[in-house]
Amino acid sequence: MPAVMVYAIGGGLIEVLISPILEACPTDNKESAMSLLHSFYCWGCTGVVLLSTLFFALFGTSHWKILALIWVLLPTANLILFTKVPIYSLHEEGESGMSISELFRVKVFWLLMAMMLCAGASEQAVSQWASTFAEKGLHIQKTVGDLVGPMMFSVLMGLSRLIYGKYGEKFNLDRFMKGSCVLCVASYLCISLVPVPIVGLIGCAICGFSVGIMWPGTFSKASAAIKRGGTVLFAMLALAGDLGCSGGPTLVGFVSSAFSGNLRLGILTAIVFPVLLLAGLCTFSRLVVKNVD
């Protein structure tokens, strides 16, 4: 348990720091760069699922400690790379960032926090249960379920972020995010209401594609709306997102358990998160227009 807590803290710090590091880089299209950055989270998840599943298939789950030692190579490589990477400041020379108390007094900040919570919940409410859904729906082993469920979700989510990262200058971020929310709602309905297992599994993959832009897109919107937010802003948004990542799957689990393990009903309940995110985006758009006027 202490080891889990320590690596969770380490992973959280990387998540908090790497987004503002990229935001400070002198790139032309920061929204695209942010999306491209977060696509590598998906490729990492895909690689971990694929390689870990392969390892367990070859050597058995009893050798999990050896696998943990092998994965130590990744944070070690990150440690070395971080010593080489030039880090720019988020603020102009002579400009200071906001304190937490200043940030808390900005009204749009709380809207962005709610949007991040919904983004995290929309993503993980399906992702965390994708393997179980595949196992129960298709009656397959856990090994195959891990490959078919979470890995397919991660690949499609990464593809969505890669597309925006490559062609972001051709898209309007606001419209892209709103369209993704609508697609996410459709995928939730497909998973929970269509009684054909393979269709539900396709819905899981579509959900992965739809949630791809939600997290990095909200980061980009926040950075543009709160210029002096700095690392504190990214840290608070990451906190809200992580709360959503925990709360979304928990809600699905509670509802499913209350209705005799009905996972479809649990996922249907979680549809509230992409709906609320869409409402938040519409409200955010009105606030931005009002401030410009």
Which role does the model predict for each range below?
Residues 171-218:
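C-terminal transmembrane helical hairpin of 12-TM major facilitator-type secondary transporters
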Residues 13-26, 212-226:
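Intracellular juxtamembrane helix-capping segments at the cytosolic ends
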Residues 227-261:
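A late C-terminal transmembrane helix in Major Facilitator Superfamily
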Residues 4-39:
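Cytoplasmic helix-loop-helix junction between adjacent transmembrane helices
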Residues 28-29, 33-87:
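Helix-loop-helix hairpin linking two adjacent transmembrane segments in secondary transporters
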Residues 77-86, 271-293:
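Multi-pass alpha-helical transporter architecture, strongest
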Residues 54-60, 134-135, 167-168, 253-261, ...:
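Interfacial helix-cap and linker-helix signal at transmembrane-aqueous boundaries
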Residues 106-159:
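Extracytoplasmic gate region of multi-pass secondary transporters
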